[in-house]
Amino acid sequence: MVQFIRKHSKEGEIDMKHLIIVKFKENVWARESEASREMLADIRKIFDRTKQIEGVHTVNIYENVTPRPNRHDLMIEMEMAQEALPVYDDSAAHQEWKAKYGEYIQTKTIFDYE
């Protein structure tokens, strides 16, 4: 039997997870390359700033470890209060992420869940 679990923050609001799953265009991302290491460090700096947004609790960035053409490259996982999502959407960090890296993204999946 599958259980539906709702996680509440300390204040009682229902928390959600916001996933950004990204596949970069060809020749943009090579996991072990120096350019990709620098790019990842910059992406981490951008998303670290989102932790300053009230209601954003955690941000984790995961790299794909299976270099196959049908795989995505990064998954950014944010845990936040549902009310924080529109604040994040309007934040300078989110706008910087889109401005700096949007042109390099081949496909992106956004998935929100409780």
Residue ranges of model-derived segments:
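Short S/T/G/P-rich N-terminal loop/turn motif that feeds into the first structured element of a domain
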Residues: V2-H72, E83-P86, E114
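An amphipathic, aromatic/His-enriched active-site/gating alpha helix that lines ligand/cofactor pockets
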Residues: A41-K45, R49-K51, E79-F111
